[in-house]
């Protein structure tokens, strides 16, 4: 019976804090032993945190994609790694591969569907603000069960998500600044305390009793709101001064509405024109005459044929005229002058020709 009670007590109540788990006291220096893969992941988080914190709203599509990727990957990894899938316990590598694939799909959906992306951005903002409230209230408030932190996380996340859908630009700027500052603070926590502050936050969310934080942890925790404030100021004054993704979406919607109205007006005019009956003529009036064929006088005349002075003279007459000029016209006149036809070769007297002259 005492063994059963001890087992139930271990399952229901949070574990006691372990001094070896939390490392050395504040007076002693920490023994830093870094590993390659966690250090690389923290460096990447620091770089993404800088982009998020100071260029979040300008890189709007990239922020939506990364937020969807983060949510999808984390949720699917926890489900696959903690639970049995098809009665099989998956390894960490298989769970990471499945989580990465589904995370990419969630990132694409968040980037393409603007409302989904804004909802996830606001939800992330609410979760981070609730976690910061739990960390800040550690010296004054200790939750009795896990339902208190869980309700605070869900309530803050849904509230910020709805507010982000209502006011996208200011809350997206705030969300990206807070998220980037959290990533930078987490990377600094790894290199300073080997993620001691992150483990403290997890234990606070589980409502487990934890020892008080060291001054190094409080300094890293104070870095978070300071970087968030700097990120908001930089984005408000520099990076988002001329960029407004909301106005772009509204202008596109207005353009589509205007085009739709113009098309509807044209369709209505076309239907009215087709349904309109022909106009009836008044009584006593005649219909206008139809245009007939054009007047023959206005037709184009043919080009007149060109004629020359020698067209009506025969070649024999021209030759006799030339002989007269040379002085032999007398002898040729006494003889029987003949006229050779130019075309048929017939020979006849020139004086015997009676009738109209032949035109050549």
UniProtKB/Swiss-Prot annotation:
Its main location: membrane. Keywords: Cell membrane, Cytoplasmic vesicle, Developmental protein, Membrane, Transmembrane, Transmembrane helix, Wnt signaling pathway. Residues 261-304, 324-360 are annotated as: Disordered. It is a multi-pass membrane protein. One of its GO terms (cellular component) is plasma membrane. Coiled coil: none annotated. The keyword Transcription regulation does not apply. Residues 326-335 have a biased composition (Polar residues). Pfam families: TM7S3_TM198. It is found in: Membrane; Cell membrane; Cytoplasmic vesicle. It comes from the Eukaryota. Promotes LRP6 phosphorylation by casein kinases and thereby plays a role in Wnt signaling. May be a membrane scaffold protein involved in the self-aggregation of LRP6 to further enhance its activity. Belongs to the TMEM198 family. This is Transmembrane protein 198. The gene is TMEM198.
């Amino acid at each position: 019976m005492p063994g059963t009670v001890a087992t139930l007590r271990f399952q229901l109540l949070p574990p006691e804090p372990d001094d070896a788990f939390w490392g050395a006291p504040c007076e002693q220096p920490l023994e830093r032993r870094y590993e390659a893969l966690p250090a690389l992941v923290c460096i990447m988080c620091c770089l993404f945190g800088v982009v998020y914190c100071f260029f979040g709203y300008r890189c709007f599509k990239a922020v939506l994609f990364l937020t969807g990727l983060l949510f999808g990957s984390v949720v699917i990894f926890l489900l696959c790694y903690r639970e049995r899938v098809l009665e099989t316990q998956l390894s960490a590598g298989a769970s990471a591969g499945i989580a990465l694939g589904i995370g990419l799909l969630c990132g694409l959906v968040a980037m393409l569907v603007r409302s989904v992306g804004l909802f996830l951005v606001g939800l992330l903002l609410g979760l981070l603000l609730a976690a910061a409230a739990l960390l800040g209230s550690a010296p004054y408030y200790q939750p009795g069960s896990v339902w208190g932190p869980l309700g605070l996380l869900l309530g803050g996340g849904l509230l910020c998500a709805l507010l982000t859908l209502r006011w996208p630009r200011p809350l997206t700027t705030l969300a990206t600044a807070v998220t980037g500052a959290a990533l930078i603070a987490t990377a600094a926590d790894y290199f300073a305390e080997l993620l001691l502050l992150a483990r403290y936050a997890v234990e606070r969310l589980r409502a487990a009793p934890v020892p008080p934080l060291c001054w190094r942890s409080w300094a890293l925790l104070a870095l978070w709101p300071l970087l968030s404030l700097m990120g908001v100021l930089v984005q408000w004054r520099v990076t988002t001064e001329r960029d407004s993704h909301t106005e772009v979406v509204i202008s596109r919607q207005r353009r589509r509405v205007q085009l739709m109205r113009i098309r509807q007006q044209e369709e209505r005019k076309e239907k009215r024109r087709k349904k309109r009956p022909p106009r009836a003529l008044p009584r006593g009036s005649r219909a206008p005459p139809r245009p007939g064929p054009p007047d023959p006088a206005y037709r184009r005349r043919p080009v007149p044929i060109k004629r020359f002075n020698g067209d009506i003279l025969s070649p024999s007459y021209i030759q006799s005229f030339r002989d007269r000029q040379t002085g032999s016209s007398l002898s040729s006149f006494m003889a029987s002058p003949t006229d050779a036809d130019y075309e048929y070769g017939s020979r006849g007297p020139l004086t015997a020709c009676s009738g109209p002259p032949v035109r050549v």
